Amino acid sequence: MTGLEVARGFINAVVERDANAAAELCTEGVEVLLPGAEEPLRGREGVRQMIRMAPQFLQSMRDEEEHDGEVRITTLTRAPGVFANYTTWLFVMDKAKIDRLSFELRGAN
């Protein structure tokens, strides 16, 4: 699988709220940097925690690129009645696994 395929699979697992499927796409030592958080979530259990904390939302893909072990996917993320923003998912890959994930947010309204 390419890095882009792994990243797409991860986003699909998040949307489906399948924490185990998302965690399996990551290295043992993965770090997830959430916007506004002081410390990253670490390890596959941190990925599972992120999915348990996430609100229900709708996503549509807008842009994606892969370059030198990094994948960037931008989505329009909507939680109806709560928020809408453009989310850029920044994946750093280690072979065919996600080693680091961070986010850039931009308002959509």
What feature does the model see in each segment?
Residues 1-20, 24, 33, 97, ...:
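Short, low-complexity N-terminal intrinsically disordered segments enriched in polar/charged residues
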Residues 48-109:
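A beta-strand edge to alpha-helix "cap/lid" segment located at domain peripheries
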Residues 2-3, 28, 54, 80:
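Hydrophobic alpha-helical segments, principally membrane-spanning helices and signal/leader peptides
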Residues 20-23, 28-69:
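A solvent-exposed, acidic/Ser-Thr-rich amphipathic alpha-helical stretch
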